[in-house]
Amino acid sequence: ANLDYDMWLGPAPQRPYNAKRVHYLFRFFWDYSAGQLTNFGAHHLDIVQWGLGMDNSGPLAVEGTARFHKQRWYEVPEWFELTYTYPNNIHVLCGQNNGTRGGVEFQGTRGKLFVDRRRIEADPPELLKQPLGDKDTRLPVSTNHHANWLEAIRAGRLPICDAEIGHRSATVC
């Protein structure tokens, strides 16, 4: 395949060609990304924003810690843990730790929910079997982002994740 590396770099700082700086691994260099937090974070943290009813807002505070590659293969952290504090003292934990659970964990008084792009788990498992009440938050169902976007255009309404919601979810990253 032919790659116009100068075109690919665009407005990013000029760097000598390095195969690690193009797809997929470009995500691990500060010039182009902030690692898995900005790669997958928008997907996971979008669920947080929905679930907490904060699509038009965000966390009040963020605290975290990170570890970088000892060999310095990449620039961004190889491991991180973040704690987001939302109104009403709600805490959301998000992290990446070398192939283990990368996703979002909700902690409540009755247990925990873990959500990633493939699954939802509960501790205790019975939490997932409890029916939702009339006032409980119900998230939109979307099996195909592109189809939802095209349907919204045809119907003249906003998609499940409009530009403002997407912006706020990305900002949380």
Task: Set out the residue ranges of the language-model regions.
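NAD(P)-dinucleotide binding in Rossmann-like oxidoreductases
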Residues: A66, V76, T83-T143
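Rossmann-like dinucleotide-binding domain that binds NAD(P)(H)
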Residues: D6-N88
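Basic phosphate/pyrophosphate-binding loop/patch that engages nucleotide-derived ligands
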Residues: A1
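A structural signal for well-ordered alpha-helical segments within the folded catalytic domains
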Residues: G35-T38, A42-Q49, T143-A147, E164-C173
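Short glycine/proline-rich turn/loop motifs
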Residues: H23-D31, L127-L132, W149-R157
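Alpha-helix N-cap/helix-initiation motif
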Residues: L37, R138, P159-D162
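C-terminal helix-rich "cap/oligomerization" subdomain common to oxidoreductases
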Residues: E75, A152-C173
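Short, well-ordered loop/turn and helix-capping segments at boundaries between secondary-structure elements
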Residues: Q14, G53-M54, K112, A155-P159
